[in-house]
């Protein structure tokens, strides 16, 4: 049924489907009272999400490694919507030091935080270690976002408490989370080049995004905090993430042309989960084409989620 919906664009229970765009799913939503951080908001899905949230009135903070690209994105959005509120801050998610620096920069703005969209990522990279000695896909896609989210939680909690507005965290996962290592997360061999598979390492990092969402969702519910966190699969979209994918991906794309989305369609699920009023109180879910769907067995394994949480905490605490 999911494949049928992807091919035909038929709407699901939410009223939206694979053919829906980010503008479609946010139609008539007024976001002027909201502040959102979007990581990687300089191209592809992230840029489209920044544009649409800015169009709907949200104060958007583009967090990006390349400050020139971020400012170019800001100028593009302002040319389209002169009254949009867009700020840019430097953030390299592969660097723990950069994440901590970003937090100081953001808190200095003295603004609330209602929405965090963990969008940035790398894909199918040849093996390399980050400056902190962590395999690059795991470092950028999971550890950087894990630390960023944890360090922003107090601000999100106070914003939700003072405004009465539900905070929302959106983790960009992927259907690729189903293609990972045999054990799901290869805890003992994350940084082992001999066991490295660029595609399985990507799948592992996307599984980690889902496990992070589910673990944090449970913790926030236990605290009674007015913040939700959900994961999304944006669909198959040609973005610069595919720069390391090579001939095999080109062949796959040619064979499955009817499944691929354009960027406005690819950003729809992100914007739907971030803004739509129908999702008030919905947390710990996995969305595809703006509808709740079922992830892999690994993704709903609470023991694995807790193990990853503890592993991630110990890892970031061990770094300056």
UniProtKB/Swiss-Prot annotation:
E.C. number: 1.1.1.-
Enzyme class per UniProt: oxidoreductase
Gene3D superfamilies linked: NAD(P)-binding Rossmann-like Domain
Coiled coil spans: none
The entry's keywords: Calmodulin-binding, Chloroplast, Membrane, NADP, Oxidoreductase, Plastid, Plastid inner membrane, Protein transport, Transport
UniProt keyword Ligase, yes or no: no
GO terms of molecular function: calmodulin binding; oxidoreductase activity
Annotated binding of NADP(+), by residue: 40-46, 92-93, 119, 140
Binding residues for substrate: 174
A Gene Ontology BP annotation from the UniProt entry: protein transport
Record InterPro entries: NAD(P)-bd_dom_sf, SDR_fam, TIC32
Highest taxon listed in the record's lineage: Eukaryota
Active site: 196
Cellular localisation: Plastid, Chloroplast inner membrane
GO CC terms of this entry: chloroplast inner membrane
Main location: plastid
Description of how the protein assembles with itself and partners: Part of the Tic complex.
Protein name: Short-chain dehydrogenase TIC 32 B, chloroplastic
Organism of derivation: Brassica napus (Rape)
């Amino acid at each position: 049924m999911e494949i049928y919906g992807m091919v035909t664009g038929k709407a699901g229970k939410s009223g939206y489907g694979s053919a829906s765009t980010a503008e479609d799913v946010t139609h008539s939503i007024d976001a002027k009272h909201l502040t959102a951080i979007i990581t990687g908001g300089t191209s592809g899905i992230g840029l489209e999400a920044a544009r649409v949230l800015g169009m709907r009135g949200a104060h958007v903070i583009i967090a990006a490694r390349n400050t020139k690209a971020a400012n170019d994105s800001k100028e593009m959005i302002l040319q389209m919507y002169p009254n949009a509120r867009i700020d840019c801050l430097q953030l390299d998610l592969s660097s723990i030091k950069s994440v901590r620096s970003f937090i100081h920069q953001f808190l200095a703005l003295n603004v609330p935080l209602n929405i965090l969209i963990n969008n940035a990522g790398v894909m199918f990279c040849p093996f390399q270690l980050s400056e902190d000695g962590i395999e690059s896909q795991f470092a950028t896609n999971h550890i950087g976002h894990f630390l960023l989210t944890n360090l922003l939680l107090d601000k999100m909690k106070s914003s939700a408490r003072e405004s009465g507005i539900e905070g929302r965290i959106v983790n960009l996962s992927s259907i690729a989370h189903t293609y990972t290592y045999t054990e799901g997360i290869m805890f003992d061999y994350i940084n082992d080049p001999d066991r490295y598979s660029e595609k399985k390492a990507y799948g592992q990092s996307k599984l980690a995004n889902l496990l992070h969402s589910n673990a944090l969702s449970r913790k926030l519910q236990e605290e009674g905090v007015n913040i939700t966190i959900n994961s999304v699969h944006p669909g198959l979209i040609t973005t610069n993430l595919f720069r390391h994918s090579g001939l095999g991906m080109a062949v796959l794309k040619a064979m499955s042309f009817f499944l691929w989305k354009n960027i406005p369609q690819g950003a729809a699920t992100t914007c739907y989960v971030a803004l739509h009023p129908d999702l008030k109180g919905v947390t710990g879910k996995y969305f595809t084409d703006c509808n709740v769907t079922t992830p892999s067995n690994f993704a709903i394994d609470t023991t694995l989620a807790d193990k990853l949480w503890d592993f991630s905490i110990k890892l970031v605490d061990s770094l300056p």
